[in-house]
Amino acid sequence: MVTGATSLSLVRDELFATMEQAEQGLEQFIAERQNGSLLQHAVECLQQIRGTLNLIELAGAELLAQEALQLATDIPTGVSEERDGQLAALGNALYVLRRYLENVEANRQEIPELLLPAINEVRCAAGQPALPESFFFSARLDIPRPPSTAIDHLPSEAELGEESRRMRHMYQIGLLGLIREQNLYPSLKLMGRALARLDSLHGGVARSRLCWIGAAAIESIVDGQLLPRKSRKQLFSRIDRELKQLLIGPAYEAPRHLLKELLYLVALSDGQGPRSREVRELHGLAPLPFTDHLLEEESQRLSGPGQSVMRSLSTAIREELAGVKDMLDLIERGVAQPDSLTNLHAQLGKLSKTLGMVGLNSAGTALQTQLPTVAAWAASGVADSPPALLRLADAVLYVESMVGNLERGERRIIRPTPAEPGQEADAFAVHQLAEARIVVIEEAKAGLALAKRAITAYLESNGDKLNLANVPASLQAVRGGLWFLGQERAALLVGGCADYIQQRMIETAQMPSEQMLETLADALTSLEYYLEGGAVLRPQGQPDVLDLASASVKALGLPVAA
């Protein structure tokens, strides 16, 4: 038997009719809550819907129907307003299910992940835990990780504990930025570095598998510009709690469900970073048939008006446009009624507002810009400008071409509102000042990035000092810029890094250990994050990040000012 999207058409009419009966029964029960037969009829319809979806093997749709059925079964007759949330979740589940099946029928493609928000809404209403993003995803979790490169200096237990705690602190600072969605991608990069360093510190063994895959997942999020969903913030918050267990437990083993969620993010992004590629190739992760942003867009469409509603609205607007076109034809031929121009102005204004309300903002704006011209015609009683009349006709034709998007559920991005008139001078002055400060900050960030690249090249070349020739001067320039901006503490820390490179790497014959070079990179990364977070532009700053940088500089054996 043919199953899935291809077989939906065989049962479509009966399935959609049953869904309509379930929706009607639920709506009537909300109005007549003492009538248990109405709710029972909705439950029976849901049972039939679930059975049909099971028969044609639409797994995601069947799961949503199953969750809705369980919730409906638990709702008693005569419920009070305290159950309104559950009834609303049921209604939304049926609505989303119908929209999803419409899309499956139209596109012949199943994406059950689109239904997870509705499924979790029903589960939440029923007091059940949410399903993870990776629920419909599968991957092997028992594949051993490849051996990592051994570090040249094995830290003592005390050193390992201190470094690990510092890396967890770095992770927590980045996590706070992720949760608040402040300085988002630099925060993720800070978290990724912390996990990568923890993996290296603990020898790249099975115990640190969570750090290895977690660093790859964060690299994938940054590369793929994945959205900061609530579920992802919760995932990385759970990882922070796991890090605590990792640091105190020699036999620590990461929970398999966390590894699966992280692998899903790697597969979803299809990023090309070195860690992402290594993890993806080892686990055989194939690219997913959708992107994160596609899921977001399609989920929004599922919760929007249905196709039938949009078709009806499109038809109504087309009829309005046909009337406008007829009126323009009469005006052009000079046989219009005396009040035609006034009526035309009113009709265009109404259409402009309607188009804006349904998301066709460019079409609405096209008509809005014509209103002053038509208003002038109405006041004078004559359309005396053939070129202007032609421009209006072009605008109407453009709108007509855009209205077809309603039936496809397409949306347009709303443009930002322009600045208030009369405030241009003040806005320009503030803008110029901000631009000047931003230039200094960008130069400082570039200097720190140059230093990090130079240190990497120095390490890879086995201590070739030519790679460091310009670094101390570059960092001293960064120090001066920060001092100029009033960031004395950050300036002193950058100066400390410059002194370390000059005195311990350039002027001495012995190359520092890889561990010390990583600590130097930690300090520069923390300072870079401080700048990327815009702390220099905000009076309150980010003292925790400077504390982290200060701890790294102190670990280098340099004096640190309080």
UniProtKB/Swiss-Prot annotation:
KO phenotype (gene knockout): Mutants show increased autolysis, reduced levels of surface-assembled type IV pili, twitching motility and diminished production of type III secreted effector.
GO CC annotation: cytoplasm
One GO-annotated biological process of the protein: phosphorelay signal transduction system
Keywords noted in UniProt: Cytoplasm
SUPFAM superfamilies xrefs: Histidine-containing phosphotransfer domain, HPT domain
InterPro entries, A to Z: HPT_dom_sf
Predominant localisation class: cytoplasm
UniProt entry tagged with the keyword Signal: no
Intracellular or extracellular location(s): Cytoplasm
The protein's assembly and partners: Interacts with PilG and FimV.
Functional description taken from the UniProt entry: Regulates multiple virulence functions including type IV pilus (T4P)-mediated assembly and twitching motility as well as cAMP-dependent virulence gene expression. Regulates intracellular cyclic AMP (cAMP) levels through the activation of adenylate cyclase CyaB. Also functions as a scaffold linking FimV and PilG at the pole, where type IV pilus (T4P), the Chp chemosensory system and the CyaB adenylate cyclase interact.
Name of the featured protein: Scaffold protein FimL
Organism: Pseudomonas aeruginosa (strain ATCC 15692 / DSM 22644 / CIP 104116 / JCM 14847 / LMG 12228 / 1C / PRS 101 / PAO1)
Encoding gene (name): fimL
